[in-house]
Amino acid sequence: MNKELKLFGDVLYISNAEYIYNDLHSIQKDDGLSDVIDLLDEDLLQIKYLNGSIVDVGWYPSFDESGYFKVMSIRRDDWENPIYSSTLGFNLNQLLEEIKIAISKI
């Protein structure tokens, strides 16, 4: 069964997800960094799959306007060696694309 993931006005359908934690749901594509900086922390999105794999998104350092998004795909709880990892500044269109790539790696 697919689970629905709402991001920046778009909807992605995630198959084989055990659960989805989505703290990005209230951010819209036209929001600026200063509009949402109080929402940006290390725990923004986590998709846990039935096979134990994880897609994880956070903002580092939390609540810091000079920070960056980090997107990772993790297998077998090996956080030290992600199968995919990307960092990027505040660009929500690019973030959506990076999340799609991370999902495709699982």
At which residue positions do the language-model features occur?
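Negatively charged, low-complexity tracts enriched in Asp/Glu with abundant Ser/Thr
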Residues: M1-N51, E80
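Short linear sequence elements within intrinsically disordered, low-complexity coil regions
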Residues: E18, L24-S26, E65, I74, ...
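Intrinsically disordered, low-complexity regulatory segments enriched in Ser/Thr/Pro
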Residues: V55-F90
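Generic structural hydrophobic/aromatic packing signal, biased to beta-strands
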Residues: I14, I47, V71-S73, I99
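Functionally constrained cores in energy, signaling, and assembly domains
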Residues: G9, S73, I106
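Polybasic, proline/glycine-rich intrinsically disordered low-complexity segments
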Residues: E80-I106
